[in-house]
Amino acid sequence: KFNSAIHVGNPARIELSGIDVLSYHGKGIDDIVPRCENVTYEKPQEAMKLMLEKRHLAPMWGERNALSPEEEDQMVINTPPDIFVTGHTHAHAVEWYKGIPLIVSSTFQGETDFMNMLGYKPKKQILLY
């Protein structure tokens, strides 16, 4: 039982002890990888840098990443966060970019057919402490 758990949407801006955290699944990375030479599924933090530069979580979309037309674009990054966390690629990375820690969470899931098709090997069960 998790009495203190709060469920949020995707993306989410949450404040933890005064620290502004941007949490995003990372689906937008799928459209960035084929279009940017330095961005790979093994180095998703490069996509995160582009997202921060462009101030949008899906600066390229339409090929693999469909976006719902809404009155307000929920993918816009109005202000840079103190911490930016994403996943989706099942990679693992921690890197600082312009004073912002970029955290790519690992996975507990095994290799999927999609990953096999891409020739990508996930980095499983990596925890930071």
Q: Residue spans of the language-model regions?
A:
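Extended recognition/assembly regions associated with phosphoester-bond processing machinery
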Residues: K1-Y129
